[in-house]
Each structure stands twice: as structure tokens, then as C-alpha cells.
Regions:
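Charged, glycine-rich active-site and insertion segments that engage polyanionic ligands
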Residues: 1-38, 43-46, 100-101, 109-208, ...
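Conserved alpha-helical scaffold flanking the Walker A/P-loop in AAA+ ATPase domains
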Residues: 9-15, 55-76, 82, 86-94
Length: 264
């Protein structure tokens, strides 16, 4: 596995001390290697790994199986940001006091999307940022290296990134012109449905916007409440949210900040 030296050292210590947690939450962006890291843990504890779904039926099936297995088994719940509360509450009962041979791993993009009661019973591992040197082992493309923070992201099509750059430039120009019309026109190029493959992926747009936001004029930057961006990032980490609508709302709020700053 590329990178993650501190996290690897942590699980080595767990193994040496015979203190591997029964419930682990791995937090990190898409492409950061959460599932790969989970497989490293499973191999370290010499357990059988099973990827489960997040529905209440599959959670209940997992619980039932966990009490009957006779060999070490690790159940993985992937992308649990959107796991419904009834599933989380059912899972809570078994992770509080795990059966003898059962381990549980949950992967999320944003740890804040997890119920506090779930989080308090798990051991949280946050995927570490990848250095430029580590990313160079997968690509030497400067565009990818500028916008990619993990190995998975380096698989992105460079043309998609360039299109996202162009769209971000249009948004920034709308901010400079204080034009809601131009802003909404730019937003029509955001992907609202999976079938709109000719439009810009919302997650990629946010990545490029965050990377370039400091290029805005100082006056504009000072009037922007960064909360709008952080809130949008949290929202789009949940698949149940309309990402395009969330970004549109964020951009409109930022434009209002800019206009209000001018008035004051």
C-alpha cells in the first residue's frame, strides 16, 4: 500500500499488543484507499473479510451471523455516510459488545456524518494525506498532481479536470461581476444526474474550486464566509444529497456575501 505509514504503524502496534479494536471507523475521501487499508487490517488479524450492504436487512443479517461464526471474521460496511439511522442503531447494539470472533469496519468520507453514539464506540482511523512523492509513483502529470490528493484521484481524466478549471473560472468571473445571471448560467454545466456525462462532476468541481479560491481578489476573499464551502463539502459527501443543488446554494450564498460586503 502506498503511504499511510503512521496508520500502518498503528495497526502493527495493535497486533503486537494483541489489542486490535473490534469496531474501527476509517475516514477519508473517495480514492484515499479506505477499503485497501481495511484489507490490510483484515490480513494483519488473519480474519475472513466480508463486505456488507448498509440496509437494515443486511445489518440484521450481519448481527445474526456474527453470533454464530467460529473463525475470526471482519464485516465491512462501505460508504456508511448515508447509512440510515435504523441500520446504525441496530449495528450499535452489536458493536457495543462484539461477539468473540467478530470484527467490524465502517468506512466514511466525513466522520461528522456518523452518529455520536456510533463514533464513541469505535476507534477512528483517518486516512493520511499523500505526499507529492507518493503520488509520483502513480503519475507524473502536473495537472493531476495539482488537484489530486490521493491515489484514486490520479485516475481522473485530465480533460475532465481542465473542464472543471474552466467552469470554476466562469464562477469566479461571476463573483467579480457580482452577476447572479452569469453564476446560474455557469451552474447549468454542473452534473445533476449520472447520465449527464458531458457535464462537470460536482465533487471534482469542488476540488478545483477549493484549490483555486485563493486566486480571487483579496477584497472578494475577505467578504466570503468559508462556512458555506465547508457545509457544502459535508453535504456532498452524502449520496442522498442533490450535489448540484447544494453547490448552487453555496455559490449563491457566497455571491450574496460579496454583494452585502459592497453595500456595507
Amino acid at each position: 500500500m502506498i503511504g499511510q505509514k503512521n496508520n500502518i504503524n498503528t495497526i502493527i502496534q495493535w497486533r503486537c499488543n494483541k489489542s486490535v479494536p473490534r469496531f474501527i471507523i476509517i475516514s477519508g475521501d473517495v480514492g484515499s484507499g479506505r477499503l485497501t487499508f481495511a484489507k490490510v487490517i483484515i490480513k494483519m488479524i488473519n480474519a475472513k473479510g466480508i463486505i456488507m450492504g448498509n440496509s437494515i436487512a443486511e445489518v440484521r443479517e450481519t448481527i445474526e451471523n456474527a453470533y454464530t461464526i467460529t473463525e475470526p471474521t471482519c464485516y465491512i460496511f462501505r460508504n456508511a455516510d448515508d447509512m440510515k439511522n435504523e441500520s446504525k442503531n441496530a449495528l450499535l447494539k452489536v458493536v457495543e459488545e462484539s461477539p468473540n470472533n467478530a470484527y467490524f469496519i465502517m468506512t466514511v468520507q466525513n466522520i461528522d456524518n456518523i452518529l455520536g453514539t456510533i463514533k464513541s464506540r469505535g476507534t477512528v482511523i483517518k486516512m493520511e494525506p499523500y505526499t507529492r512523492e507518493e503520488l509520483l509513483s502513480t503519475t507524473n502529470d502536473e495537472v493531476l498532481l495539482k488537484y489530486c490528493s490521493n491515489v484514486g484521484q490520479t485516475m481522473e481524466d485530465v480533460e475532465n479536470i481542465k473542464n472543471a478549471e474552466y467552469l470554476v473560472d466562469e464562477v469566479f468571473q461571476a463573483f467579480r461581476d457580482k452577476s447572479g445571471t452569469k453564476l446560474l448560467k455557469a451552474c447549468t454545466n454542473l452534473r445533476g444526474k449520472q447520465t449527464e456525462t458531458d457535464k462537470c462532476d460536482c465533487t471534482l468541481f469542488m476540488r478545483v474550486l477549493r484549490k483555486n479560491i485563493l486566486s480571487l481578489d483579496t477584497g472578494l476573499l475577505q467578504s466570503i464566509d468559508i462556512y458555506h464551502i465547508s457545509r457544502c463539502m459535508q453535504e456532498i459527501s452524502r449520496n442522498t444529497i442533490n450535489n448540484k443543488a447544494s453547490i448552487e446554494c453555496m455559490l449563491i450564498n457566497i455571491l450574496e456575501d460579496i454583494k452585502n460586503a459592497e453595500i456595507s
